[in-house]
């Protein structure tokens, strides 16, 4: 889990890169869940919340989401 204070220290480009990585991870977790291979269901919720945090910080910095 990332803290908002850690995210605020990053540049907009780094945040966008982090956001893309999180979206990829969320997709992968959804596919694992659909195929029955997912063992850590809590990761889905944690990744969704991390995506929300990154989007919030991007909005604060004025970077388009």
Swiss-Prot record:
Keyword Ribosomal protein included in the entry's annotation: yes
InterPro entries: Ribosomal_protein_uL29 (IPR050063), Ribosomal_uL29 (IPR001854), Ribosomal_uL29_sf (IPR036049)
Keyword Metal-binding tagged: no
GO process annotations (BP): translation
SUPFAM superfamilies attached to this UniProt entry: Ribosomal protein L29 (L29p)
Keywords of this entry: Ribonucleoprotein, Ribosomal protein
Transmembrane segments annotated in the record for this chain: none
A GO CC term assigned to this protein in UniProt: cytosolic large ribosomal subunit
HAMAP family recorded: Ribosomal_uL29
Similarity remark: Belongs to the universal ribosomal protein uL29 family.
Name of this chain's protein: Large ribosomal subunit protein uL29
Organism from which the protein derives: Methylococcus capsulatus (strain ATCC 33009 / NCIMB 11132 / Bath)
Biological classification of the source: Bacteria, Pseudomonadati, Pseudomonadota, Gammaproteobacteria, Methylococcales
């Amino acid at each position: 889990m990332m803290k908002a204070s850690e995210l605020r220290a990053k540049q907009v480009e780094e945040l966008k890169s982090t956001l893309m990585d999180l979206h990829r991870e969320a997709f992968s977790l959804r596919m694992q869940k659909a195929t029955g291979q997912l063992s850590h269901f809590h990761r889905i919720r944690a990744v969704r919340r991390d995506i929300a945090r990154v989007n919030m910080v991007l909005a604060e910095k004025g970077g388009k989401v």
